């Protein structure tokens, strides 16, 4: 029989689901005492090369309030050609096409190995993919040139029938006509005036006179084919023209006097982009790709004035309510994000500058629409160029690894309700019997819209057990959840992916050991971290840390083995032993610690809310590898005791790859030993972490910042700030101390944290 660890991994590979608990407490009261909520990390479009889509539509439950999809957990009467829904127990007739089914001739959706299945929907018109570039021209000459080259390169990666458009902005905003042969023509808008969607569409000539009964008909893509084709053209038609147009783009002509910032109308440019797509291609897969090299400095959405002597807001300003433009700008971008999400479009933000660019205010544009957020120093760096190129990578079938306009519908058995979701989604406000009144994350609904998805996009979905304590579930009972994802595939097909899972119920009084053994501490750490980061958006940082600490203490009290008032007796089983360590590193992470970070570090939170379990764990607790002459590279503790003079360290934090040379290694390299034939093994030692780093850099999206440093180097701070400070300037000379690098910090170490946790867990006062 498979261990729980193997069971968890098999389910993740097959269904893209990781639950915090894999045996569920059978009553509401007991579930609340488990501290960590019943929740899962769902990767709706997890890549499955072994899962070809079926070319027919799913069979749905006939009950209007259910509509669950036929799945392997349903009971089937093959003689009567009936099936019973495992969610509402409605008996349903099979459609005529299923007349030949039997125990030995089952459709794929009834086979146990197809707990996840994908359907291709044949009906409905297919729409091309749409890419609308929104380009900042207030860049330095070399930055603008590099960006133009990247955009020209991207045209060759788009499908020939994809529609593409171009908006440029500086002090003014220009919407470029692409249907003109031989001449450049554009519509120019003032960057200071906020325009409604109707005004934008009227000015661009996208509306046509109202006709009787016109309002009753839902908008269809390409309702005004001529009007929209002036601004959005198939790549194969305008490849050469647009390449030339991009090549001719000049820096914003308005002069910038000394001591001033360029006037940058980002808010108006985005508003026009949203209005253009809203009027021409509602409910069609589209990406608005914003490239900006500085903060918006005029018009709606501005985050700082043009006077350089007045700095952009800091966390200190925000705490003191001294960020003059922040609330108004955030409101503007939230309004745009909600409109974009309602139309099924997504907004990507590519912000490359040495100073802040206003990501704090603009973050909702990417967060609510499932768009990408990329932050760099310059468009002329390999970090941006390679990250941008990776957006257009293809899967094993030659299709883009991106999907559009998805809706996620979650169905549960009667003992469960849905509390909410955390991830790149917006609520569709679909109430129903399976929706909980207690919200966690984006709640009050059983359906969410995810406008931009890729194979690693992951949502945290939280549930509530509602079965009462006095109505026991029969022995061997199982709870079920179904995830139904409707989306537009990058091949323009409409598809539905259905994942149906079940887990055993258990009585906590008699089967607590089973529940404990089925605890997934990695998934639980990420799910609790997402809750903490979600709360940090609206609560004070210290309050969030206190909440996380309280939850950790309660969990240790519930599942630890100890004698009252005796910290030395405290033990956690293997299922829980790593969880406190994850919480320790989470408390020190940039997701919760804003000190010494700029407000644009909301970039980190953006990625944490959308990455899968493996990448999220790396963000919480970076991986550290050690290279030495004594053997192959090995993972070592993320601890200052691992920093040794004769070692090379490779640290992966997800956002950075750091190679650190110990003191002796750095001296040998300076002496040039690697160039001497007799020290070839030293040359290989220096090369090994570089090769491994290259492998990570090639696979990661977005591409991490690459840092090569050594003992005493200024960039060694990236490593020193992450390791557990077991050796500091305060305890450096403690008796029996291992050799290692002391960290100059007053932060508590993991050992002190654990000692304090044990004291509180065994205390009867807590």
UniProtKB/Swiss-Prot annotation:
Keyword Disulfide bond: no
A molecular-function term among this protein's GO annotations: GTPase activator activity
Top-rank taxon, per record: Eukaryota
Gelsolin-like repeats: 633-719
Subcellular location: Cytoplasmic vesicle, COPII-coated vesicle membrane; Endoplasmic reticulum membrane; Cytoplasm, Cytosol
SUPFAM superfamilies xrefs: beta-sandwich domain of Sec23/24, C-terminal, gelsolin-like domain of Sec23/24, Helical domain of Sec23/24, vWA-like, Zn-finger domain of Sec23/24
Modified residues (N6-acetyllysine): 564
Main localization, broad class: membrane
Gene Ontology CC entries for this record: COPII vesicle coat; cytosol; endoplasmic reticulum; endoplasmic reticulum exit site; endoplasmic reticulum membrane
Positions carrying N-acetylalanine: 2
Subunit field text: COPII is composed of at least five proteins: the Sec23/24 complex, the Sec13/31 complex and Sar1. Interacts with SAR1A.
Record function comment: Component of the coat protein complex II (COPII) which promotes the formation of transport vesicles from the endoplasmic reticulum (ER). The coat has two main functions, the physical deformation of the endoplasmic reticulum membrane into vesicles and the selection of cargo molecules for their transport to the Golgi complex.
Family classification: Belongs to the SEC23/SEC24 family. SEC23 subfamily.
The protein's name in its UniProt record: Protein transport protein Sec23B
Gene expressing this chain: SEC23B
């Amino acid at each position: 029989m498979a261990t729980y660890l193997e069971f968890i991994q098999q389910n993740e590979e097959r269904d893209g689901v990781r639950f915090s608990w894999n045996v569920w407490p059978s009553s509401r009261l007991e579930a609340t005492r488990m501290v960590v909520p019943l929740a899962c990390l769902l990767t709706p479009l997890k890549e499955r090369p072994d899962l070809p889509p079926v070319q027919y539509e799913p069979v749905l439950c006939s009950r209007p309030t259910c509509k669950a999809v036929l799945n392997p957990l349903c009971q089937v009467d093959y003689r009567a050609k009936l099936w019973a829904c495992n969610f509402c127990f409605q008996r349903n007739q099979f459609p005529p096409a299923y007349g030949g089914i039997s125990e030995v001739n089952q459709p794929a959706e009834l086979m146990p190995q197809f707990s996840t299945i994908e359907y291709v929907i044949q009906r409905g018109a297919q729409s091309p993919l749409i890419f609308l570039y929104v380009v900042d021209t207030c860049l330095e000459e070399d930055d603008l040139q590099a960006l133009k080259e990247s955009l020209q390169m991207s045209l060759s990666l788009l499908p020939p029938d994809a529609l593409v458009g171009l908006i440029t902005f500086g002090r003014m905003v220009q919407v470029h006509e692409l249907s003109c042969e031989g001449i450049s023509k554009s519509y120019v808008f003032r960057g200071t005036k906020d325009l409604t969607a109707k005004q934008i569409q009227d000015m661009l000539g996208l509306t046509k006179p109202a006709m009787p009964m016109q309002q009753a008909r839902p908008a269809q893509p390409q309702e005004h084919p001529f009007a929209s084709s002036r601004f959005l053209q198939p790549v194969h038609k305008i490849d050469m023209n647009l390449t030339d147009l991009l090549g001719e783009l000049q820096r914003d002509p308005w002069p910038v006097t000394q001591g001033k910032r360029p006037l940058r109308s980002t808010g108006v440019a985005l508003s026009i982009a949203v209005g253009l797509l809203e009027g021409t291609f509602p409910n069609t897969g589209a990406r608005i790709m914003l490239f900006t090299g500085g903060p918006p400095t005029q018009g709606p959405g501005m985050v700082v004035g043009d006077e350089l002597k007045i700095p952009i807001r800091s966390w200190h300003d925000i705490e003191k309510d001294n960020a003059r433009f922040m609330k108004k700008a955030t409101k503007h971008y939230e309004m745009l994000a909600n409109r974009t999400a309602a139309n099924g479009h997504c907004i990507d933000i590519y912000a490359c500058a040495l100073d802040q660019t206003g990501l704090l205010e603009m973050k909702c544009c990417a967060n609510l629409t499932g768009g990408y957020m990329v932050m760099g120093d310059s468009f002329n760096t390999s970090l941006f160029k390679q990250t941008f190129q990776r957006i257009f990578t293809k899967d094993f079938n030659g299709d883009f690894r991106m999907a559009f306009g998805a809706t996620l519908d979650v169905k549960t058995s009667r003992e469960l309700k849905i509390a909410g979701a955390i991830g790149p989604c917006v609520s569709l406000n679909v109430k129903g019997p399976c929706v909980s009144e207690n919200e966690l994350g984006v709640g009050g609904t059983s359906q969410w819209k995810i406008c931009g998805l890729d194979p690693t996009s992951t949502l945290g979905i939280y549930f509530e057990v509602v079965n009462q304590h006095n109505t026991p579930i029969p022995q061997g009972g199982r709870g079920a959840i179904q995830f139904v994802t409707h989306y537009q595939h990058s091949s323009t097909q409409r598809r539905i992916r259905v994942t149906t899972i079940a887990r055993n119920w258990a009585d906590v009084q008699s089967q607590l050991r089973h529940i404990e053994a089925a605890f997934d501490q990695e998934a639980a750490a990420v799910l609790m971290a997402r809750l903490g980061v979600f709360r940090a958006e609206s609560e004070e940082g210290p309050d969030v840390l206190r909440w996380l600490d309280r939850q950790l203490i309660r969990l240790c009290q519930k599942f630890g083995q100890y004698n009252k008032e005796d910290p030395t007796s405290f033990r956690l089983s293997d299922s829980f032993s790593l969880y406190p360590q994850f919480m320790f590193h989470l408390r020190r992470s940039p997701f919760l610690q804003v000190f010494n970070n700029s407000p644009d570090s909301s970039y980190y939170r953006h990625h944490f809310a959308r990455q899968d379990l493996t990448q999220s764990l790396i963000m919480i607790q970076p991986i550290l590898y050690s290279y030495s002459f004594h053997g192959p590279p090995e993972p070592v503790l993320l601890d200052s005791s691992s920093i040794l003079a004769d070692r090379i360290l490779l640290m992966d934090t997800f956002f950075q790859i750091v190679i650190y040379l110990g003191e002796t290694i750095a001296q040998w390299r300076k002496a040039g030993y690697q160039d001497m034939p007799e020290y070839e093994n030293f040359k290989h030692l220096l090369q090994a972490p570089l090769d491994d780093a290259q492998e990570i850099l090639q696979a990661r999206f977005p591409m991490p910042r690459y840092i090569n440093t050594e003992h005493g180097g200024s960039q060694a701070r990236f490593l020193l700030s992450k390791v557990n400070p077991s050796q500091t300037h305060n305890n450096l000379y403690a008796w029996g101390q291992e050799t290692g690098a002391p960290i100059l910090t007053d932060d508590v170490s993991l050992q002190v944290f654990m000692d304090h946790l044990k004291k509180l867990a065994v205390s009867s006062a807590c």
